[in-house]
Amino acid sequence: MVRCRVRSPSESPQQGSGQQRENERQDQDQELRPEDVPVYGRTHRGRYHYRHRSHTRRRRSCRRRRRRACRHRRHRRGCRRIRRRRRCRRRL
């Protein structure tokens, strides 16, 4: 993190032309600010990022997928019970 440097009163010139003061202001504006510095590494990409994967998944049975769903989530929500169970429709 870059911290802004604060000049002491004795360090800053009391007298001088207006042009020098303008140059000093521009120099202060060009200093790096924490929000301007690019962040490398992990950044917040959104909460649904884990679902989109480049590799193709192998097909699994519905039971296995359903069990894993609530464990996989970060905030462990209870499994939602489905009143009507559907059977897998496998194409031959």
Swiss-Prot record:
GO terms for cellular component: nucleosome; nucleus. Proteolytic processing into mature chains is required for histone eviction during spermatogenesis. Transition proteins (TNP1 and TNP2) are required for processing. Residues 1-76 are annotated as: Disordered. InterPro entries: PRM2. Pfam families: Protamine_P2. Keywords: Chromosome, Developmental protein, Differentiation, DNA condensation, DNA-binding, Nucleosome core, Nucleus, Phosphoprotein, Spermatogenesis. It comes from the Eukaryota. Residues 21-36 have a biased composition (Basic and acidic residues). GO terms for biological process: chromosome condensation; nucleus organization; spermatid development; spermatogenesis. The modification Phosphoserine is found at residues 8, 10. Belongs to the protamine P2 family. Protamines substitute for histones in the chromatin of sperm during the haploid phase of spermatogenesis. They compact sperm DNA into a highly condensed, stable and inactive complex. Interacts with TDRP. This is Protamine-2. It comes from Sus scrofa (Pig). The lineage of its organism: Eukaryota, Metazoa, Chordata, Craniata, Vertebrata. The gene is PRM2.
